[in-house]
UniProtKB/Swiss-Prot annotation:
GO cellular component: mitochondrial inner membrane; mitochondrion; proton-transporting ATP synthase complex
Annotated GO biological process: iron import into cell; proton motive force-driven ATP synthesis
Name the record gives this protein: ATP synthase subunit alpha, mitochondrial
Location of region: Essential and sufficient for enterobactin binding: 228-248
PANTHER family hit by this protein: ATP SYNTHASE SUBUNIT ALPHA, MITOCHONDRIAL
Amino acid sequence: MLSKRIVTALNTAVKVQNAGIATTARGMAGASGSEVSKILEERILGTETGINLEETGKVLSIGDGIARVYGLKNIQAEEMVEFDSGIKGMAMNLDVDNVGVVVFGNDKVIREGDIVKRTGAIVDVPVGDGLLGRVVDALGNPIDGKGPIANARRSRVEVKAPGIIPRLSVREPMVTGVKAVDSLVPIGRGQRELIIGDRQTGKTAIAIDTIINQKRFNDAGDDKKKLFCIYVAVGQKRSTVAQIVKRLTDAGAMDYTIVVSATASDAAPLQFLAPYSGCAMGEHFRDNGKHALIIFDDLSKQAVAYRQMSLLLRRPPGREAYPGDVFYLHSRLLERAAKMNNSLGGGSLTALPVIETQAGDVSAYIPTNVISITDGQIFLETELFYKGVRPAINVGLSVSRVGSAAQTKAMKQVAGSMKLELAQYREVAAFAQFGSDLDASTQQLLNRGVRLTELLKQGQYVPMGIEEQVGVIYAGVKGYLDKVDPSAITKFEKEFLAHLRSSQQALLKTIREEGQISPQTDAQLKDVVVNFLATFKP
């Protein structure tokens, strides 16, 4: 009799369990694999955890920096999530049955079954004056060992670029201190100028010189001329970034500079995010009526990181295996550089993106994309670099589409004819090597071209003021150096600049403040050059 009762009780228990399993199976139809078996096991054991699937989820799989998460039903696109281990991630793929999350850090500490929580916030970073002089990672966390960042508020990394009405056309010069750039491909505040070339051709050198050159304006105390700088290092070696920070510190340029670093050893999502984080920091200055310069070094590596993420998220590949929206990746970033109108404070954000080409091929996918987005490009050539022409700027292929409107009148007056003369020189030089008997005008063109090319050479980390550039270029363009041996041009420039700085400060001040060469200044400059050449010994 007792055994009969036990059997009846067991049968009842099995029926209850079966009913529970059927309910669970219907409720969890969206889950798969180990997740389903885990939930069923918990239900059978009567230890249901009661997780809220709207606000939390569980890791189904983890690998290659991508986590597939079950749950998180209410999550937004690009929302930050937090894993059990404290590592942050960003929701990129919102699929029917799971969420694809890119992990901002080491995915080795994340396990299957870990809880993932929504933060309710889109990815944001600290912005403000407190970041000046600091080195931060792609999420704005300090990595320079100088303690937490003070005096900063938080801002989203992805914001919409300013529309047409809030903008003004580019009108103020952004002086780089590099003669070849300021005279031939001038850049204005609010412009996007691409620096493009093969590896080891001096792309970063131009960018760093530009940052160092802003010291003269920032030290002058005029808020309208101050330019704050953001240097974004993407996919570079840590040793290279440390070297750049040391160089900027030695030059006293870190006082007005922020360095955002996502090095080669950082996760691909951080390399993808770093340019947007840097841009948000630059927009703080732009939107508060100040001026900022941002350097993306380089966007080729950001595109590679984005390709890696997209392929791992199973997004369909396109040309060169890049995803279909790789153009939008860069356009939405670079469109945020702008010159704002006066009612919005008149601030500006200037962008100098860097692109690395392979064997000088500017017709590849990413280079052509960025060329079409920017307002001009500075093209650096390996061949010129090895010939000793440094900066190795190909004047024929380099162009600034809007910068001439911002160029100072003094520079326009002296450098106006130089681009044409150099273009004619290159054309004639190609034919001159085939024949020796040249007419006088062709010989004159060759002589002038050789000397102007020598004159545009410049050492690294020695940017020049615009008034000094005007003085040197004036001597070359007006023909005063035609009789000076090309090998002595560098010596002439060095001694002539020393002469101007020591005994012609009033003349330099006039050029700097008036911004143009009046007939009186022209006569004065002529006298200075002629008198100096009379005593110059090559």
